[in-house]
UniProtKB/Swiss-Prot annotation:
Record-stated family: Belongs to the PlsY family.
Subunit note: Probably interacts with PlsX.
Protein's UniProt name: Glycerol-3-phosphate acyltransferase
Organism of derivation: Bordetella petrii (strain ATCC BAA-461 / DSM 12804 / CCUG 43448)
Gene name in the database record: plsY
GO process annotations (BP): phospholipid biosynthetic process
Compartments reported by the entry: Cell inner membrane
EC number: 2.3.1.275
């Protein structure tokens, strides 16, 4: 599928396009279209699905989740449509660009979300089985421990592992994708640093817990 290198100009254009797609702030767009408060003004102030859910509108949160995941998948799909036979290196850079677009969106002054849904969309574009295994990991941890952040961190940690040991990855060719996934994992941990501190302190909110 992905095997040849496009021109430097085309590669740069695909990477830039992926960043712009990743920068689309679905949390803000969906909230505005549905007449809700800007998610950057309440809760964690994070423009993501979890914070939109704090508005009490589950439909808006679901649409935000789907939108954020879709842009991760779409950026990679579009790159492959525009440049058939895309090299693994450019493919990996496009994935990183889309993810960084969500974390540091040009449309929101480079202050974006944490990237969980967008990362899932990227995994789906790489391989549906990889996305399924990672999502299943999230669900298992969330059900047993009731911490959304912990589930995201554990799932993010295992995503590169699943990629490494799943479906006979040819590292001489597909290594850049594995490196990109490792970088995405590190960035996810960095964006969740406040959650990690609360988990260690025992003050992180559990899923379904009512605020006092």
């Amino acid at each position: 599928m992905v095997q040849t290198a496009p021109s430097i100009f085309l590669s740069a254009a695909l990477i830039a396009l992926a960043y712009l797609i990743g920068s689309i702030p679905f949390a803000v767009v969906v909230s505005k279209l549905m007449g809700l408060q800007d998610p950057r003004s309440y809760g964690s102030k994070n423009p993501g699905a979890t914070n939109v859910l704090r508005s009490g509108n589950k439909a808006a949160a679901a649409l935000t989740l789907l939108g954020d995941a879709f842009k991760g998948w779409f950026a990679l799909w579009l790159a492959q449509m525009l440049a058939p036979g895309l090299s693994w290196t450019v493919f990996a850079l496009v994935a990183l660009a889309a993810f960084l677009g969500h974390l540091y969106p040009v449309f929101l002054g480079f202050k974006g979300g944490k990237g969980v849904a967008t990362a899932l969309g990227i995994l789906l574009a790489i391989h549906p089985g990889l996305a399924l295994a990672t999502a299943a990991t999230w669900v298992i941890i969330a059900v047993f421990f009731r911490y959304s952040s912990l589930a995201a961190l554990v799932a993010a940690f295992f995503a590169p592992v699943y990629y490494l040991f799943g479906s006979g990855v040819a590292w001489y060719a597909q290594g850049p994708v594995g490196v990109a996934l490792a970088i995405i994992t590190l960035l996810l941990f960095y964006r969740h640093r406040a959650n990690i501190a609360r988990l260690l302190a025992g003050t992180e909110s559990r899923i379904g817990a009512k605020k006092k």
